[in-house]
Amino acid sequence: RGLGDVYKRQPHTISEILQQSSHIQTIAKKYSHFEEYFFLGRQYMFPVSLEAALKFKEITYINGVAYPAGEMKHGPLALVDTNTIVIALCGNNHTYDKMISNIMEVVARKAHVLLIAPTGKSSYPPVQDQFLLPIYPFDELAIFPYSVVMQLFAYYIALDRGCDIDKPRHLAKSVTVE
C-alpha cells in the first residue's frame, strides 16, 4: 500500500480503536492507582510518548515522563522498580528489536509494562498487558492511532481517579497572557 492509501484508512483504523475502548478501560483501571509513569518510544514513537506524558499530567494529575527508549540506561533505569508503570510504544520499523531490548531491561527490574505494538510480530516481550494496533507500513502515520490509544488510556485513568476531565485544574484553553 502507498502512503496515500494508508492515510485515507486512518478514520477506519481510529474507529477500530474506539470500538476496543473497553479493553483500554480495563487496562487503565488496573493502573490508575500508580503515581509515576514512564513513556518510552523510539523514532516516531518518541513524540507520541511526549504527548502521552503531557496528557497524563493535564487530565490525570499523575507525573508522566517520556524518555527516548535508547536513553533508559543513562539514568532513568535507576528509577524503575515494582512501583513503576512503563508504557512502551513500539513502532513497526527497524527500531522494534531495540525497543524490545529496552522493554526487557525494565521487565528485569519488575516494572509493570503496557506494550503498545503492531500486530503480526513473531514475538512479544513477556509483559503484563498489551494493546496491539494494525501494522502500519509508514510509522509517520502510525503516530495518529498510537496517540488515540494514549488519549483513551489517560481518559480512563482520569475517570477512575475521579478527575474532572471536562475542566482540568489550572489548564487554560489558550494562552491569553505573556
Can you annotate each of these PLM segments?
Residues 2-7:
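Short, small-residue-biased leader/transition segments that mark boundaries at the very start
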